[in-house]
């Protein structure tokens, strides 16, 4: 019987359904109503390639009826973990991420494990096992917890004792009380809760020193130094909770942010393949089948009651929330989630512009302050990311009044001259912050210098791209385009504003003058006292400078530095 005919015979009850090809599992899913869900697959197959793949690769269809959806969820997780179906590929997290386990023994030690059921206190997870190995090595070197798997009783210690990696509890070379102090210190090191253990260590150091046990005192002193470095480097905490996993779904990426001891310790991106059918709760459920459930799980999408029950079966006191803390949200938006998807950008660009996506984009912005200190900025997008080494700032030389168009023309012309002279590479595209007026200025410069560059402008209020060939493209609903062009526009604006502020800053005077040979402390102070900004200094007449004892060459050197910036 073919699969379509089998679907008609499927039960209208909760359970799990399995697409197979002989012994190979193709896809496993769950449903409140098995037949209804399978009919949905069948219908979507006609429009979606990703659904059709399951049917094309399957020869058999099976199902298992359960009492409710919650039972179906648990069964689905077990089956996926056991059989690793082809089209549940993103759910195959295997044995989970490594953690450092502080063992629950008479003489505890640390070990790296992926088994969340082992007894002891787990710290992590570590997305990079090499980091876990380095930390374990540091713990043995600093706190000298035993290195053996099982602690035998023996008359002489092993080589690790002589190497300073173990305190030798197996040979009674350390008291149980002193070993417990080392364990407490190691735990503080792993958890970051250092301040609670430091007073005990200081007290013990004094006690050992008073009893002339200087070797023991030195051992604890080394621990204090390591732990004090943690205190000094903790900085600002991100969140007021000790332990939370944050999941952020954006486009075809699911991001995981791991917070431990109020700090962001790791993040990871799970890329979602469009050709696969993905249930985000299945993905998270499978992740927690082999990883530690934290005190709190936060997601920017709804988590069903059944999923929550499943997680609570692994940890009763777990809490859930849809509210991502603002400090972390800013980090997500600035550094990770807003990282543009290059392939999506190229696809959207070709679809909307009818031409190949640019690899090298130069984006321009003009900034001034109350009609003065007009500056220009250029930021660069190259091969899928910002290239800050190619950023340029421009101090406007030919315009003494408020005229953004004339200022832009100067900046673009100066840039064009370097391109024509082969000093710099020709970009694929110029993106100008502004509307049709700025676009016209870009086209004018392009035609004057005979440049082979695609000219566009981006109007901020409307979020519309205007192109030299007459297109007007609203980009807000095109995620990848909006990310790249919005990122470039905002970066150019930030870069220009920073330069503008620097020109208006008295502190910037000293910073710049320190780069010029022959300008000593006296001349720096004269310039600093008589000018409010570098802008005022380079605009001053030579006669005034002469009276102050400042040579014209210093002014020219400042101009050169500002021009190079």
From Swiss-Prot:
Annotated Gene Ontology cellular component terms: cytoplasm; excinuclease repair complex
Listed GO MF terms: DNA binding; excinuclease ABC activity
SMART domains reported for this sequence: GIYc (SM00465)
Pfam family, one: UvrC_RNaseH_dom
GO biological process entries: nucleotide-excision repair; SOS response
Domain of life of the native organism: Bacteria
Native source species: Hydrogenobaculum sp. (strain Y04AAS1)
Entry protein name: UvrABC system protein C
Complex and partners: Interacts with UvrB in an incision complex.
UniProt keyword terms in alphabetical order: Cytoplasm, DNA damage, DNA excision, DNA repair, Excision nuclease, SOS response
Residue runs in coiled coils: none
First-listed, main subcellular location of the protein, grouped into a coarse class: cytoplasm
HAMAP family: UvrC
